Amino acid sequence: VGMRFFNVWAEEGSRDDMLYRMLQEGTARYLTRHKRDWVHVEDVCSAIEKLIYSDYTGVVDVGTGVATSVLEFANALIGENELPIQEWTPKEPDILKANPVVLREMGWNPTPFLDKIQSK
């Protein structure tokens, strides 16, 4: 089985170049209005578990299927901020989100980003 991971995030253990960590450390230089599918690492792990115990042999999107803007992601995590908005980024699609139909048919139900933040 092949797995296509979308924007994986976690409160701890993220790399230096990941947006969540840059926001926490104050090293992010700008934000965009691009929409991305933010999937929590716990949901990714449960998706992998579902897939390794299944007979599925294709490629699977591992994401919530819900797109939230980079700006909304930042504001939900650190509150309103003064970072500049970069309106256009070359080679970046405006919206990028998973189509998790295969995993949902297996009973996988990830928590959308904003719901995950509000539950913390």
Where on the chain are the PLM-derived regions?
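NAD(P)-dependent short-chain dehydrogenase/reductase
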Residues: 1-37, 41-45, 49-50, 76-78
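Residue-level signal for the nucleotide or nucleotide-sugar donor/cofactor binding architecture
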Residues: 13, 17, 36-42, 65-68, ...
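Residue-level preference for the first positions of well-ordered beta-strands
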Residues: 1-2, 57-59
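Amphipathic terminal alpha-helices
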Residues: 77, 113-120
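C-terminal "lid/loop" region of Rossmann-like NAD(P)-dependent oxidoreductases
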Residues: 29-33, 59-60, 68-75, 79-100
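Structural element of the ATP-grasp superfamily
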Residues: 22, 102-104
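Short-chain dehydrogenase/reductase
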Residues: 6-7, 59-62
